[in-house]
Amino acid sequence: MTHTQHRPDHQLRTDVTEELAWTPSVNAEEIGVSVTDGQATLSGYVGTYPEKEEALRAATRVHGVTVTADKIAVRHGHDVPGDADLTREAMLVFDRRSVVVPKDSVQVEVRDHVLTLRGAVPWQFQREAARNAVAGLPGISGVRNLISLRPSATAAPAEMQAKITAALTRHMPEQSRYVEVGVDGTQVTLTGDVPTAAERRSAEQTAWFAPGVTAVDNRMTLTD
């Protein structure tokens, strides 16, 4: 793969700032941006936790940004639920909504408006669904997802590697040849390089789809 010159940090800073302003779900006026060696840092304040996540995603979308560091704080209004109320609200979410996690598999704790999820589920998509189901609750400043994975199906490392490699070829036929898949037990390691952060995320998501995977170490780098 051909490597070209990296874009200067000052240009990336301008691009990230413009992308934040372009994102309708983000109030960019109170968000500061700095970039060092392609690594963007966002600081300042937002009104909700989902807005904070949207800001971080916006920065990651900018071509040339390799890492996005989070120094954004959530600034709540006056009528903020307490930790006990937030805990009850989070548990109600799992009781009353069609969240794709096994019943009674997730436990919730809230301290200083930071919500912690514990428990075990078979798939990564269920782990993510549990987190997404409560991340938008009013008054939440952050979510720690400590849910572990206990797959209901297993596969031999060679079989798992072959399935992931085949899926990568289907999803990204041109770039998949630059991606190396390693499997150690139930843990997958991705190495190599791709042009965009979106393709890097796509490769990781593909690895998570393989039955039996409990961890994905994404070491892929971006070419510019």
Model-derived features: where do they sit?
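N-terminal targeting leaders
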Residues: 1-224
